[in-house]
Amino acid sequence: MKKLSILVIALCMACGSASAQQALFGGQMPLSPEIHADKTVTFRCMAPNAQKVQITGDFLPTRKMDTPMGQFDAPGVAELTKDEKGVWSYTTTSPLSPELYSYTMMVDGASVTDHLNVYTVRDINNVSNIFLVDGGKADLYKVNKVPHGTVSKVWYEDAKAGITRRMTVYTPAGYETSKEKYPVLYLLHGIGGDEEAWMDLGRASQILDNLIAQGKAKPMIVVMTNGNISQEAAPGYTSEGFIVPTLGLPKTMEGSFEVSFPEVVKFIDARYRTLANSQNRAIAGLSMGGFHSLYISINNPKTFGYVGLFSAAIGKEQKSGGANEYIYDNLDKKLADLFAAKPKLFWIGIGNSDFLYKDNTAFREKLTQKGYPFTYMETDGGHIWRNWRIYLSEYVQKIFK
């Protein structure tokens, strides 16, 4: 009885607190973001004592930003205005196209998330809010009323790395109740990412669920590894505890991950009901993951029947002299070996303002000169998730057919 009384008091206090907050705004908390019928969007921020509030996000016109890695298209910035209640707001000047968007706010120069929007994603060490304007391709990124696959976090012993590591595995709807064997796509993230990236930022499970339900993609297993060979798992899920996510981890792009990858394939073939041959095995990745996909496939020319490079890093400018850097030697000969094995698809996608565009153009020219067949897709924009979701959506409709 005493416990019940305490619970009732606690609930009353919580309700009173919520009511007090709502009373400040006429009984209703501000909504942010608010997607209007015409697909303009209003963002709001409760900061009555702030002097300046801004918003930055990929729904705004881009601005050029120079970085050590090249020139990037950075999200634009817009100013919010304050009303008499201390609520700041900004409404887009035109309707937004269907897409999954991300944004953050800046209150007196400090970057913050939108406290009125609980939906966030992490990209390296940046946390952003997200919202979706539905319709068109964005409907692939939604959870729709279709059969859903299962997403598992799977630990495995990485003998090459000498540690236990984690991967994310998607199995299609019906996997658990059937005896059928399935093809496998190995889907790799970019630098600074991890085994969470394609699920959280790339909407991989939603894309697969929807395209499989529409009959546009074959049911498949999707394996999303952690491409940082020195890392057990994504930050917060390792024995190191709540570490700060960072770029430039040890052994990044020096061959160790590529050398270890055949063990991942063996593990998946042993643990899951797979069609264990090259015609039912695909690999693809974005940026560093495209780099990994290229060098894993050319060093194992009979392993993958489908190769996808999404805004891929192509060449390695500097070598550290490590024992595994032979992986990057003899590119021309290894490409010849790969195409001699007759892959069913070699797919390349990149944005026309991507800082890796020139490298990809030179690589495509090499393939053309050698007479190697490939499929190419060019989109607007730069080195961004908006493009990589498109590439994944296109690629999975072409493999295993």
Go through each PLM region and give its residues.
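Bacterial Sec-dependent N-terminal signal peptides
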Residues: 1-23
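Non-catalytic cap/lid and distal C-terminal segments of serine-dependent acyl enzymes
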Residues: 35-401
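Hydrophobic alpha-helical segments, principally membrane-spanning helices and signal/leader peptides
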Residues: 1, 22-24, 29, 174-175, ...
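N-terminal edge beta-strand
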Residues: 21-42
